[in-house]
Amino acid sequence: LDDCVMLADMEPDFGEMDSMVKEMEEPLRALMGTFLEISGSNDYADNQYQKAKEYHAVIYANADAFAAIAYDFVDAVGEMGDVRMAEEENRLKEEGMLINYNASRAISIGREVLDEAYAQGIDDWNLNELDLTEIRKLHDELVAVVADFDAATADNDQLVKESLSNSRPFDGLLDGLIDALEWIMKQVESGELPDMSGSGAPLGSLEHFSYVLGQCIDRYNTVFVD
């Protein structure tokens, strides 16, 4: 925690995010101290649980104060990440790194699909309430981006430019992402909820789409980052 506060005073300046880190320090430090006391305390029942009541009062007050800032902080981090990703994708496109660009863009669209669902308050337990208006637009963009990715990987000169020897660096994973999204759309259009009673993520569920997206991210990191 001390390191986080110290970094908030250092360059680069992240403006409001630095301020939020400092605002979270006091309630978070109080929570950490209280939990540390609880872990070493054996007298909960003494004095009609008075000590436990004192702990709870500190936890409730500071948890609310921390959460009020923490959620905004997480949103701010996400927004900053989106901006930086957009800048990186623009750079890749301008430099003609079309395989890398389209792979990254496909993954970004996948994240936008999940963001859209969650912004609507949707999960797999109320998936049939998902408004597909924006989802369909994202689907069409994803199809176009994956088509551009396939065209770029079919170009030997482009493979050489990006130092790739494999013309199928994603082994069809991006096509699988399209399929996973189309299964969601069909599931919603059916009016039925996906069967979540099994051990795996069923086709047509957000959980399955998230799993496939995770595979794409792992492959991207293997091909372009690692």
Predicted features by range, described:
Residues 1-48:
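Post-signal peptide N-terminal segment of secreted/secretory-pathway proteins
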Residues 16-19, 23, 58, 98, ...:
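Extracytoplasmic/periplasmic, Sec-exported soluble proteins
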Residues 28-31, 102-107, 177, 181:
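Short, structured motif recognition centered on aromatic/hydrophobic residues
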Residues 32, 36-64, 192-207:
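Polar/charged, Q/E/K-enriched amphipathic alpha-helical segments with strong coiled-coil propensity
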Residues 39, 46, 74-77, 81-84, ...:
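Coiled-coil heptad-register positions
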Residues 56-174:
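Extended amphipathic alpha-helical interaction segments
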Residues 136-226:
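A cross-kingdom marker for long, charged
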